[in-house]
Amino acid sequence: MTGIETISAHDLDKYYGDRNVMIIDLRDKEEYDASHFDGAVNIPYEELDIFEALPANKTLVLYCDRGSASLLAARELMQRGYRVKS
């Protein structure tokens, strides 16, 4: 398995509008509602057990408030065959 590609918050802008990418905000709903990256969908880390519902044909770009949840989720998703960045 290769390493997880990490990106900065600044680099997140590069993925906005890319139809081959799904941006996922892993924070809880309250944090997402208060502020989130335009175009991101909210799937709290605790609810990410719906792996089957994620598109296998897109790169998943994950973010959270500190980076630790997104790295854990990225590792889990990579093991299931998804292309991910955190």
What label would you give each PLM region?
Residues 30-32, 49, 70:
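Glycine-rich nucleotide phosphate-binding loop and flanking beta-alpha elements
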Residues 14-15, 48-57:
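Short amphipathic alpha-helix with an adjacent loop that forms part of the alpha/beta core around
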Residues 32-38, 51-55, 77:
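Short loop/helix-cap segments at secondary-structure boundaries that form the rim of catalytic
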Residues 1-34:
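Flexible, polar/low-complexity N-terminal or interdomain linker segments that lie immediately upstream
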Residues 53-86:
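Catalytic cysteine-centered active loop of the rhodanese-like fold, especially the PTP/DSP P-loop
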